[in-house]
From Swiss-Prot:
Organism whose genome encodes this protein: Hamiltonella defensa subsp. Acyrthosiphon pisum (strain 5AT)
PROSITE patterns hit by this protein: RIBOSOMAL_L36 (PS00828)
Entry protein name: Large ribosomal subunit protein bL36
GO biological process, one term: translation
Family of the protein in this entry: Belongs to the bacterial ribosomal protein bL36 family.
Keyword set, alphabetical order: Ribonucleoprotein, Ribosomal protein
GO terms of molecular function: structural constituent of ribosome
Length: 38
């Protein structure tokens, strides 16, 4: 999981999700694309 100031979709399978006020990106295709804003 990457922690970044600005999170962006890295491929078309990435999904933006907001959990408890934290923006996250999850990807079913490429687990390396997981990100969290912080």
């Amino acid at each position: 999981m990457k922690v970044r100031a600005s999170v962006k979709k890295m491929c078309r399978n990435c999904k933006i999700i907001k959990r408890h006020g934290v923006v996250r990106i999850i990807c079913s295709d490429e687990p390396k694309h997981k990100q969290r804003q912080g």
